[in-house]
Amino acid sequence: MDDTILRVDDIQKFYGNKGNLTKAVDHISFSVRKGEFLGIMGSSGSGKTTLLNCISTIDTVTSGHIYVEGKDITTLHGSQLADFRGKKLGFIFQDFNLLDTLTAYENISLALSIAGTKPSEIQKRVPQIAKALNIQEVLNKYPYQMSGGQQQRVAAARAMVTNPAIV
């Protein structure tokens, strides 16, 4: 059984026009199996953010293919792309992007609400993920009432609560 969750196959990304091309990603290939963690390291300007933007469908590749659970995401457009982002990706932003007017519980449950999850399921899953990340004590707090580490774990909970293929 192939448990490859992500396969990046010979991708390239260029910016600019024909007379002034910048190569941001040059023939990158790798795969990640379910449960594995991947770290991407490199100097400034080496293409790390561009690579992640292509994997997350924020940007498109110039050539090559990216497969998530065997599906070529470089061919997705419109509603297929929106559906993929909503169901298969979980984002944790560097600055967390928690909504200041919502409690931790509401920030986490928002991802489930957007995904169309039933309220009874939301009431079950939010406490489960909060327990797993040891943030039960902040569920009724607003972001300004939490430490940076607590905010980071709430953002991680929000990204993971929908069980995406990739975080």
What function would you assign to each model-found segment?
Residues 4-167:
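ABC family nucleotide-binding domain
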